[in-house]
């Protein structure tokens, strides 16, 4: 999808850059594949804020997306491509030969009337789902499972992908978007291709209101608070905070490594992630 620069007839439109979604379905989603969704507003079951800066936003219906892709050997035809307000990637509505409808993550380049299929023996084409052991080295994949039959977890956001590096016994080496090279069981499934909506990283919302529509509330800087509210707060006039950046609870941030040392999954990591500058 291309980018759309709006005519600056108002101040809020002056810097707005959006993704042109003219090729997407404009109607309602498939009724049998949506369920109600209640926004938590960043609260847990006790009503305590666990994620700050969340709340409000437009009402949304949850689309039931097939992340397991375990209907093997049955071809499915792409009926349409749709926008999903709950994720950055686009969805593809597919109809299987037996008449069943399903939503899948749309890879880049997938078009209406294209045919996708899952299972052993499938061609290595965008949208097809295979076991990692059946995918040749150098192929870009997305929606990768960490456990067989567990459903895709890795590389599901817009424009994301992982690259198959090679075989290592019962495992496959996979290079993730962070630069980390990880061993994953060859029986785990992945979908061929790069996730759709590559230009999502280039959009500019243009105004605070559009961020509120998405369910994000304002973020207040710590140095603008009082000492009771944040370690960076207080001081006469404007200050720099007087210390390295920390969270409201005093935990170092902005580059501090948060991964627990000695995790059992460390043995599956061949090359640690590289921080992007």
Swiss-Prot record:
GO CC annotations, alphabetized: large ribosomal subunit
Domain of life the protein comes from: Bacteria
A GO BP entry: cytoplasmic translation
SMART domains: Ribosomal_L2, Ribosomal_L2_C
Record keywords, A-Z: Ribonucleoprotein, Ribosomal protein, RNA-binding, rRNA-binding
Pfam families registered for this protein in UniProt: Ribosomal_L2, Ribosomal_L2_C
Compositional bias segments (type: Basic residues): 254-264
Gene3D superfamilies registered for this protein in UniProt: 2.30.30.30, Nucleic acid-binding proteins, Ribosomal protein L2, domain 3
InterPro entries recorded: NA-bd_OB-fold, Rib_uL2_dom2, Ribosomal_uL2, Ribosomal_uL2_bac/org-type, Ribosomal_uL2_C, Ribosomal_uL2_CS, Ribosomal_uL2_dom3, Ribosomal_uL2_RNA-bd_dom
Single GO term (MF): structural constituent of ribosome
Location of region: Disordered: 225-277
Entries under NCBIfam families matching the protein: rplB_bact
Protein's job: One of the primary rRNA binding proteins. Required for association of the 30S and 50S subunits to form the 70S ribosome, for tRNA binding and peptide bond formation. It has been suggested to have peptidyltransferase activity; this is somewhat controversial. Makes several contacts with the 16S rRNA in the 70S ribosome.
PANTHER family: LARGE RIBOSOMAL SUBUNIT PROTEIN UL2M, RIBOSOMAL PROTEIN L2
Quaternary structure and partners: Part of the 50S ribosomal subunit. Forms a bridge to the 30S subunit in the 70S ribosome.
Family: Belongs to the universal ribosomal protein uL2 family.
Record protein name field: Large ribosomal subunit protein uL2
UniProt source species: Anaplasma marginale (strain Florida)
Gene, per the UniProt record: rplB
């Amino acid at each position: 999808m291309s980018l759309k620069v709006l005519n600056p007839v108002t101040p809020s439109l002056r810097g707005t850059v959006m993704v042109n979604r003219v090729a997407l379905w404009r109607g309602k989603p498939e009724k049998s594949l949506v369920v109600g969704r209640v926004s938590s507003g960043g609260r847990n079951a006790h009503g305590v804020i666990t994620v700050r800066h969340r709340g409000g936003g437009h009402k949304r219906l949850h689309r039931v997306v097939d992340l397991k892709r375990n209907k093997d050997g049955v071809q499915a035809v792409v009926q349409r491509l749709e926008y999903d307000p709950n994720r950055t990637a686009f969805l593809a509505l597919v109809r299987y030969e037996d008449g069943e409808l399903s939503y899948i993550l749309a890879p880049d380049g997938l078009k209406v009337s294209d045919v996708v299929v899952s299972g052993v023996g499938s061609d290595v084409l965008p949208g097809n789902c295979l076991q990692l052991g059946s995918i040749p080295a150098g192929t870009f994949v997305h929606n990768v499972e960490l456990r067989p039959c567990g459903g895709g977890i890795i590389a599901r956001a817009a424009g994301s992908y992982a690259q198959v590096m090679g075989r290592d016994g019962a495992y496959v080496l996979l290079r993730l978007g962070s630069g980390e090279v990880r061993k994953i069981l060859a029986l785990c499934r992945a979908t061929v291709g790069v996730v759709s909506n590559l230009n999502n990283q280039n959009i500019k919302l243009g105004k605070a209101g559009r961020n509120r529509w998405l369910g994000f509330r304002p973020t207040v800087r710590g140095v603008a608070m009082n000492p009771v509210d944040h370690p960076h707060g207080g001081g006469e006039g404007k200050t720099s905070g007087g210390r390295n950046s920390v969270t409201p609870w005093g935990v170092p941030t902005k580059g501090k490594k948060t991964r627990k040392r000695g995790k059992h999954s460390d043995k599956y990591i061949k090359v640690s992630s590289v921080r992007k500058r």
